[in-house]
UniProtKB/Swiss-Prot annotation:
This is CTP synthase. GO terms for cellular component: cytosol. It comes from Bacillus pumilus (strain SAFR-032). Keywords: ATP-binding, Glutamine amidotransferase, Ligase, Magnesium, Metal-binding, Nucleotide-binding, Pyrimidine biosynthesis. It is an enzyme of class 6 (ligase). Residues 292-534 form the Glutamine amidotransferase type-1 domain. GO terms for molecular function: ATP binding; CTP synthase activity; glutaminase activity; identical protein binding; metal ion binding. Mg(2+) binds at D71, E141. ATP binds at S14, L15, G16, K17, G18, I19, D71. Its EC number is 6.3.4.2. Pathway: Pyrimidine metabolism; CTP biosynthesis via de novo pathway; CTP from UDP: step 2/2. It comes from the Bacteria. It catalyses: UTP + L-glutamine + ATP + H2O = CTP + L-glutamate + ADP + phosphate + 2 H(+); L-glutamine + H2O = L-glutamate + NH4(+); UTP + NH4(+) + ATP = CTP + ADP + phosphate + 2 H(+). Belongs to the CTP synthase family.
Amino acid sequence: MTKYIFVTGGVVSSLGKGITAASLGRLLKNRGMDVTIQKFDPYINVDPGTMSPYQHGEVFVTDDGAETDLDLGHYERFIDINLNKYSNVTTGKIYSTVLKKERRGDYLGGTVQVIPHITNEIKDRVYRAGKETGADVVITEIGGTVGDIESLPFLEAIRQMKSDIGRENVMYIHCTLVPYIRAAGELKTKPTQHSVKELRSLGIQPNVIVVRTEMPMTQDMKDKIALFCDIDTKAVIECQDADTLYSIPLDLQKQGLDKLVCEHMKLDCQDADMTEWTALVDKVQNLSKQVTIGLVGKYVELQDAYISVVESLRHAGYAFDADVQIKWINAEEVTAENMADFAQDVDGIIVPGGFGDRGVEGKIIATQYARENKVPFFGICLGMQVASIEYARNVLGLEGAHSAEIDPETAFPIIDLLPEQKDVDDLGGTLRLGLYPCKLNEDSKAFAAYNDEVVYERHRHRYEFNNEFRQQMEAAGFVFSGTSPDGRLVEIIELKDHPWFLASQFHPEFVSRPTRPQPLFRDFVGASLQASESK
């Protein structure tokens, strides 16, 4: 029978519930378990696809085209699995489904209520994650903090599951904070005690408490938490701030978290072989080289907006024994006069995705600088579009060339709306989303990176290169090195007379892994490192 583990949070948000859940998933997978994982978000939006990155951070796209929470990126990178639309559930999705059923008459005229209709729908999403994947263990992170009004239906649903399928098949892990009061020089356990008290008032007794702290805890403190929270002392797991996220699974293993799970759920499984992971962490903590990448974006104040891009750059660095340093460059502040100052200490420039006109001209200027000064350049999604616009303006001389998204009146719409998008009115869930094939030209940097004729990458866009300008651009030296198999959609562009200048319409950052860097990121960082060493 499938086992279900629920990870909740207390005291404050952003405690690292997602990293805890992902780390546990890695440990159980290395014990031979088939693991899947999901995130429940209490907000009323159907998905984060139309939310501002300032509100939510990155939107992570799955193979099947679901627009999801950034924690799914952590899950995929840690556990090395590809998730799907069942892996991210919001209050908006739950209520939308229940209301559709009510309109169809599925409830036979009954009064639709939070209990049982909403809670039953929540439980169905948990069970479906296990059924669709055939997993031995389903790990579910409950977003938000215990005590939030929005989280109550989710907590009630997972409380009911203990009675529905048996205590030995359900486990609750509660993540809390033990703050360090610098003026007193003390760690305080009282917030954890109150958080667990709140959780217990809702009918959930945690089996394990994972304590986030910036200072080491004493055994007396663990004993105190165990006493007041009614759990075994060995079930109080300390999680100190770490130099690298990838060391967390090893820290949790040392304290026996995976063993506690296996004992509680009566899982007969082997010990976790973490040899490869230990080697990864050892490499990450002892990198001998350094390379600096300038990231030109419009959301740089909130770095979580680019979290998969940053992690992919770091993964690529590991392949070269290099620590990748990110220089955050606000695209709105970039001008033709100051771009050289911004680029003075960078070895490569990356322009990631984004929507809207804010900062676009700064990105175009940064792209021009990289092209003219032979600085390794990597554009992603909007980054490919601005690279195309820049080339049209400054090489072909098409003054005012732009994207129809930014300037609908431009005489030279180098980037235009996809034909299938012209009659679409809704914003949410209507982009070209998910995994699509890309056919590569053999004589190209893209082919050299992948060493394959056809590759599959994840997409999230509504606009595409306008084929009316393709022949003209190609004649001027612009290389279309990757297209859809039918040749209709441009997927990758590059320049031949440049050390490394490449941009993709798709989002390669969504498939990178710490032990298996994405090929384009790998070669971009490699070219940047080479540029650094030749200075």
